[in-house]
Amino acid sequence: MTHCCSPCCQPTCCRTTCCRTTCWKPTTVTTCSSTPCCQPSCCVSSCCQPCCRPACCQNTCCRTTCCQPTCLSSCCGQTSCGSSCGQSSSCAPVYCRRTCYYPTTVCLPGCLNQSCGSSCCQPCCRPACCETTCCRTTCFQPTCVSSCCQPSCC
């Protein structure tokens, strides 16, 4: 994992461009940068998703939108999936299925990390407030909205 390691749940020692951690049990690396790079959603610019558990990494991207990240065979964006999601590895914004500490949800086409349509729920790493039928959350700092969705979403 020379270009990309999982982001951090807790502060840990960092390389210049890469955090190395198993979130709940952070481990240090041999070389530390002078300015810590480990933040809840920080690493290299092309790999900035929070995680709750170790994330498998590709060349320049982590796919870590949930508590149990999935390895992908090719580089995908934050709202895309690849072969390990059971979809094309072309990184089109298609279905992602993730298992969280809370319910398993399915992100439908067109869903963004914090903005979804009426038929889309986002995975939750911690309890999150909901809007209509859409979970709106970031893993470590859930954003509460005025109304709550069905229990199956959050």
Swiss-Prot record:
Signal peptide: none annotated. Residues 8-152 are annotated as: 14 X 5 AA repeats of C-C-[RQVGE]-[SPSTNQ]-[TASL]. One of its GO terms (cellular component) is cytosol. It comes from the Eukaryota. Belongs to the KRTAP type 9 family. In the hair cortex, hair keratin intermediate filaments are embedded in an interfilamentous matrix, consisting of hair keratin-associated proteins (KRTAP), which are essential for the formation of a rigid and resistant hair shaft through their extensive disulfide bond cross-linking with abundant cysteine residues of hair keratins. The matrix proteins include the high-sulfur and high-glycine-tyrosine keratins. This is Keratin-associated protein 9-9. The gene is KRTAP9-9.
